[in-house]
Amino acid sequence: MTNLNNQLKEFKNTIKVERSKLLPSPFDMVYKNFEKLGYHKQNEQFFYDNASIIIDELRNQSWIEFKKIEKEFSKKLYSHLLDQDSENYKNMTVKEGIEKFTSKHTDEIYALQLSNTQSRRSRAGKEFESIIELVLMGANIEFVTQGSIGSGVFESSELAKLVNCVVPGAAEYNLNKRNTSLISTKTSLRERWQEVGDEMSRTKAKEMYLVTLDESISEKTLKLIEKNNIIIVTTKSVIDKNYLNSSNVISFEDMLNELHIQLLQWNNYGYPATELNNKKELYQTLIEKYDGNMFVRNYYENMLSNINV
């Protein structure tokens, strides 16, 4: 039994190692398809006009690509198991071989399937975040991600967990919360939104855009969310199918236009020198980080060029 447990433990570790080697990161997958679809060549207005289509196409293309890669990944792991005792299958029919293989490696097969399921769930959220960030960049909306600024800027750990982006940035959030917006990306809604509303009230932030693809938000939840200054943002197709009569649900195109108008309020703002230097250092770091992703690098170079220190 101990030997079997060790074999299973070793196989689980092999899954982890091979997954990190064979599967691209969620961002890399999305960015590759972003360029493949030619969005990196589009102008700013294209993103304002077609954000919903861009998001749908990027999601679909990334899913198609991912399934191909995951299939090859799973194939390699099953081959790894088969190679351990391939001699035992030589004189068997295909049916006999499959029966023996599945019987002998039930735990390993389950471990791989479970790992694939968990990976899909995790990747779906991260890919969605990457898509939204690229759309914001394409529309030339200034923002920073929670990952680039850390959670310390927010009043509570609960709020920090929910916020993915701050428009236009952490400096502005500290200087004047009423002229900033928080963006939370969730493929589906599972949070306890009453608590989120309480957190929002304490921050004095103007609003939170809850970006989602959830097609089954109840009327009760929509009313609760609206009460707490949280605006649902989704694609035009999801609105047409599910939320035509919901005033608190807007399209990605609507959100981009609202954010653009909000950013105008920061033109000619008298920033403290320390905040400007912090912004400059952040953008320089991000330019280096995304040196191999020209579209992203160009976005941050543009943001940096707009800073007058």
Predicted features, each with a name:
Residues 176-236:
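Catalytic cores of nucleic-acid endonucleases
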